[in-house]
Amino acid sequence: MSQAGNSPLYAAIDLGSNSFHMLVVRHIDGSVQTMAKIKRKVRLAAGLDEHNALSKEAMQRGWDCLSLFAERLQDIPAEHIRIVGTATLRTATNVDLFLQKANQILGHPIEVISGEEEAATIYKGVAHTSGGSGRRLVVDIGGASTELIIGEGFEAKALTSLKMGCVTWLENFFKDRQLSARNFEAAIEGAKQTLLPILEQYKSLGWDVCVGASGTVQALQEIMLAQGMDEVITHAKLKRLQKQAMLADHLEELEIEGLTLERALVFPSGLSILIAIFELLEIDAMTLAGGALREGLAYEMMSELRQDDIRARTIGSIQSRYQLDSQYGQQVANLALKLLQQVGDVMWIPEPQGAMLLETTAKLHEIGLTIDFKKGGEHSAYLMQHLDLPGFTRAQKFLMGEIARRYREGLTSLPEQHALSGNSGKRLLRLLRLAVILSHRRQPSLEPEVTLSAEGDKLTLAIDAQWLENNPLTAAELELEANRQTDIGWPLVIESR
């Protein structure tokens, strides 16, 4: 593997209680690009006996996995590698025996980090990859521990690591593999008892948003999306999934639409812990974080990437990597936001994320032109939906891509999406299309003075008659756009004044 001098590789390895993970990234254009993700289910925690000693079989599973990882580490500088062990290695009484051989296999030292250090690193991973402002509560359910962190920006204000996880809760409460109400109740109550000591501190600190940063939360979101729900996790949805799980008598028979076979074994135990957290901390809603422990380790090695506005960093990186006209992107964004303000801002698009999604789509809508002009919109959609965009959720990427697909020429209705209401998504598209037409000369000083007003879904664009006469191409484009929007039930009137 050759290394370009200006984009060195970094590796972060997490020896977890359920799985071992390896993340390989490179630093490019002010952002982080994922080069490889390798995961092996080792179930280390399941190998602990009653004296907390790791079985030979569990250690061998771990060593076999590390032999695979070692090959990938050969061409990465030692100072760009971090390897950490978490809850099970903190607990194991014979950890030295495991580490001695593990260090030999990898050729690099393994750090067994404390629960508090694990929580702090998880928070860094979330802060560097998840957008949004305000105070956040971060929940990470691992195999043998659960981390809860409250922080703001890059600063953690409360860090806790609790001795409960999806593997240990499986052994403690679902040992008979029965998915009964009794087992679920016991698992939820056990988790609540574990949470009680931190309850007062966390409630007094409070938070604005809650994010989940674990395989359990990722599995839940995949299930919900597969079943046609939106990506926001709520208590009602968790209880609904508990009922679905209880339709199977035994764990081996568990089949839920969207649940992978790999996650099925520890799904009920992880679900029980999350239900307890929602109920005890009275959480309204949770979304999936963009990263956690491994991302935190990687970003710790790249301190120059620290920037408070994650989304701004992402947009800047994409504009640089794809050589977009950032000044024009800003012009379209400014005009689109001005039009949004004229039609009533949150009165017309009530969701707080609406303006941000409009601005981002405007700044990146031409990305597809780097591939081809004729199908530029299609390429824009594909790139925006498939690029790694820290700070944006999967649903947000999907909506922005679908709007960018339709930013010019032929107009079709948006498909079902879960980032905003259907009405708000449609309205963002209408504003972007108008902003693109009105700014096509790519100079802010050449834009016409316009006033956009709304009566429900009917839009009226008032524009100077003399300007229209002097700019016949734009006048024709606006007339055509009025027909296109009106034809699919979105009335648009162009009014000269």
From Swiss-Prot:
Keywords: Hydrolase. It holds the Pfam family Ppx-GppA. It catalyses: guanosine 3'-diphosphate 5'-triphosphate + H2O = guanosine 3',5'-bis(diphosphate) + phosphate + H(+). It is an enzyme of class 3 (hydrolase). One of its GO terms (molecular function) is guanosine-5'-triphosphate,3'-diphosphate diphosphatase activity. Pathway: Purine metabolism; ppGpp biosynthesis; ppGpp from GTP: step 2/2. Transmembrane segments: none annotated. GO terms for biological process: guanosine pentaphosphate catabolic process; guanosine tetraphosphate biosynthetic process; nucleobase-containing small molecule interconversion. It comes from the Bacteria. InterPro entries: ATPase_NBD, GppA/Ppx_hydrolase, Guo-5TP_3DP_PyrP, Ppx_GppA_C, Ppx_GppA_N, PyroPPase_GppA_Ppx. Its EC number is 3.6.1.40. PANTHER family: EXOPOLYPHOSPHATASE, RETROGRADE REGULATION PROTEIN 2. Catalyzes the conversion of pppGpp to ppGpp. Guanosine pentaphosphate (pppGpp) is a cytoplasmic signaling molecule which together with ppGpp controls the 'stringent response', an adaptive process that allows bacteria to respond to amino acid starvation, resulting in the coordinated regulation of numerous cellular activities. Belongs to the GppA/Ppx family. GppA subfamily. This is Guanosine-5'-triphosphate,3'-diphosphate pyrophosphatase. It comes from Vibrio vulnificus (strain YJ016). The lineage of its organism: Bacteria, Pseudomonadati, Pseudomonadota, Gammaproteobacteria, Vibrionales. The gene is gppA.
